[in-house]
Design a protein with these regions (language model features):
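Extracellular protease catalytic domains of secreted zymogens
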Residues: 156, 164-193
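Gly/Ser/Thr-rich loop/hinge elements
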Residues: 95-153
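Extracytoplasmic/secreted envelope proteins and their assembly/folding machinery
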Residues: 68-75, 89, 101-105, 154, ...
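Mature extracellular/periplasmic domains of secretome proteins
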Residues: 73-79, 141-145, 171-174
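Flexible, low-complexity junctional segments that flank or bridge functional domains
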Residues: 1-86, 94, 100, 110
């Protein structure tokens, strides 16, 4: 409909739309954090490449661990392909759950790291009385589905959106193996959830 208003002696006509629209709810997408994985062969080097975008074990509202299982399947495939190097692309990974991070690291680390200290969860003074501290260890081979790659080193691609559990990967594997970081400075949010 048209409305007439007066401003400064001029007539101004405005078109006003008063139509409401109903739309059905959009379908929920299940987007796996494993964006892509591939094998690159260069002479004797068999390089696994993985773009991993979030440390989630399953989609919101689910309790089936399907994303962790997909991650294990990728590493089982890497193991079948006998990769001897890994490029882990975390440029767009803002973090996620520490347990999923621990799973990923347990599949990357040298076998000698399995069962060793992965991280120690310490809480602030207010919560320390309630929770104390928890020592988390790299998972044993049986808990990673036989998918430990026993790698000698890791290459991690980083960017300004690399944060939290992504930084935990870098910092917590370094005591056990060389981790080569390629890219820009990470966000600097080295905390877990």
């Amino acid at each position: 409909r048209m409305e007439k208003t007066m401003q400064g002696g001029f007539e101004i006509y405005q078109t006003v739309y008063e139509k409401s629209v109903s739309m059905d709810a959009a379908e929920t997408l299940d987007v796996s954090p494993v964006l892509t994985d591939t094998l690159i062969v260069r002479g004797s080097r068999r390089i696994g490449y993985l773009v991993y975008n979030e440390f989630l074990s399953e989609p919101a509202g689910a309790s089936d661990g399907r994303y962790d299982e997909q991650l294990k399947a990728v590493f089982a495939d890497f193991k079948r392909q006998h990769i001897n190097e890994l490029v882990l692309d975390l440029r767009y990974n803002g973090g996620g759950y520490v347990n999923t991070c621990r799973l990923l690291c347990s599949m990357i680390a040298p076998q000698s790291a399995l069962g060793q200290v992965f991280c120690i969860e310490r809480f602030n003074d207010d919560l320390h009385a309630l929770y104390g501290e928890t020592v988390l260890r790299f998972l044993p081979e049986g808990e990673v589905g036989g998918c430990n790659l026993n790698l000698a080193r890791l290459y991690v691609l980083t960017g300004p959106w690399t944060a939290s559990s992504s930084e935990l990967v870098i910092n917590n594997l370094r005591p056990y193996m060389p981790v080569k970081v390629v890219g820009t400075t990470t966000e600097g949010k080295n905390v877990g959830s």
